[in-house]
């Protein structure tokens, strides 16, 4: 697997230690350093990251950062994603026999980004193509390393969804998303909420991961639920299941709800291909 990622060099001060340089170099490339420990033969790095989709990129960054910082010892990593245990190259014994060099203090942080997006709607009964130009804000409050609150707010600058007036063909009863046109017609009624949810991540046992979510989960549903994932280190597949208790939101897409509730569940299989044509795949079966 060849990456197009370009390593970013960090700026150092004259009096920076090799560990300060190592931290700056790694964090300049989108990876957080939680802890550095050292033994006579090796250095242990506890890292957290959400940016890079491939472990090869992370390893490339660590190699380049170690060289740039002048670190000559073997580097062992403990990689976490939202505090879920991903890759671990050292154990408790290594940690107990090491010297603590650095530990980041946990603190809250807030990230926000606003941009323009285009929302198409194809092959409706009224017309083949409808669409909207949206101004979207995505924000995330990191309360703890494994506890987040994220929001998505939308405002329609221009759309032609008001033309979507023909009702769905009522072939089957309880077509859950058959009233999507009622949601789309409300895009022009001011700011609406695409998502506002809490997420909590935990790895209770090696290779076993849980995520609990609650709040406004998407444009049409709010609720609470969890996802279980089994992922073994160095494998290219994962599997699990998810269960959610959801309530349908009203068409204004703010805080109101409709008189429809359901419990959904699905089994999931994930596969990552590293061969000539790299790709990620997800196969899911269940009630949505």
Question: What are the residue ranges of the model-derived segments?
Answer:
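Phosphate-interacting basic helix/loop segments used at nucleotide- and nucleic-acid interfaces
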Residues: 22, 29-30, 208-211, 222
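Short amphipathic alpha-helical segments with coiled-coil-like heptad repeat character
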Residues: 53, 236-238
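Outer-membrane beta-barrel initiation region
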Residues: 1-202, 255-265
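Outer-membrane beta-barrel strand-turn architecture
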Residues: 131, 139-147, 202-206, 216-220, ...
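Gram-negative outer-membrane beta-barrel proteins
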Residues: 120-126, 157-163, 218-222, 234, ...
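Exposed, low-structure sequence patches enriched in small/polar residues
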Residues: 21, 132, 232, 242-254, ...
């Amino acid at each position: 697997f060849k990456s197009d990622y370009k390593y970013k060099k960090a700026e150092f001060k004259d009096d920076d230690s090799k560990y300060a340089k190592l931290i700056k170099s790694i964090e300049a490339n989108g990876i957080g350093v939680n802890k550095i420990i050292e033994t006579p033969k090796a250095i242990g790095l506890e890292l957290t990251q959400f940016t890079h989709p491939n472990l090869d990129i992370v390893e490339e960054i660590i190699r380049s950062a170690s060289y740039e910082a002048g670190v000559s010892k073997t580097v062992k990593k403990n990689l976490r994603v939202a505090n879920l245990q991903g890759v671990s190259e050292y154990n408790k014994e290594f940690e107990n026999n090491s010297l603590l060099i650095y530990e980041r203090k946990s603190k809250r942080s807030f990230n926000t980004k606003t941009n323009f997006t285009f929302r198409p709607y194809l092959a409706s009964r009224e017309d083949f193509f409808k669409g909207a130009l949206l101004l979207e804000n995505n924000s995330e409050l990191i309360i703890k390393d494994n506890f987040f609150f994220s929001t998505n707010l939308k405002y329609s600058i221009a759309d032609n969804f008001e033309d979507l007036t023909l009702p769905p063909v009522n072939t089957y009863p309880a077509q859950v998303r058959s009233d999507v046109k009622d949601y789309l017609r409300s895009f022009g009624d001011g700011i609406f909420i695409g998502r506002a949810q809490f997420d909590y991540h935990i790895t209770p046992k090696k290779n076993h991961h849980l995520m609990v979510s609650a709040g406004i989960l998407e444009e049409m549903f709010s609720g609470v639920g969890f996802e279980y994932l089994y992922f073994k280190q160095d494998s290219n597949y994962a599997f699990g299941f998810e269960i959610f208790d959801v309530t349908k939101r009203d068409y204004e897409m703010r805080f109101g709800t409709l008189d429809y509730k359901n419990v959904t569940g699905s089994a999931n299989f994930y596969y990552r291909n590293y061969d000539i044509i790299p790709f990620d795949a997800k196969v899911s079966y269940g009630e949505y």
